[in-house]
Amino acid sequence: MANIKSQKKRVLTNEKAHLRNVAVKSGLKTAIRATREAIAAGDKAAAEAAYKVAAQKLDKAAGAGVIHRNQAANRKSGLAVAINAL
């Protein structure tokens, strides 16, 4: 355990940030999974609706620094290509 007061504060802050990041990543996975399931089902309308939600979550996660902005762009691009192939 840390002995310095500021280190103790950082441990708590880092834990809160970690929990927040895990929650954001979990939401991302859920949104992307919903989009991929709609694509697999061949339902273009549902896939586009799910993509809109997933793209918004990816952009927010990238803006918050949870994922890199290039990773968000690559994931959005991959989903868009799959939807356009329907």
UniProtKB/Swiss-Prot annotation:
Keywords: Ribonucleoprotein, Ribosomal protein, RNA-binding, rRNA-binding. One of its GO terms (cellular component) is small ribosomal subunit. InterPro entries: Ribosomal_bS20, Ribosomal_bS20_sf. GO terms for molecular function: small ribosomal subunit rRNA binding; structural constituent of ribosome. One of its GO terms (biological process) is translation. Gene3D superfamilies: Ribosomal protein S20 (1.20.58.110). The keyword Hydrolase does not apply. Signal peptide: none annotated. Binds directly to 16S ribosomal RNA. Belongs to the bacterial ribosomal protein bS20 family. PANTHER family: 30S RIBOSOMAL PROTEIN S20, SMALL RIBOSOMAL SUBUNIT PROTEIN BS20C. This is Small ribosomal subunit protein bS20.
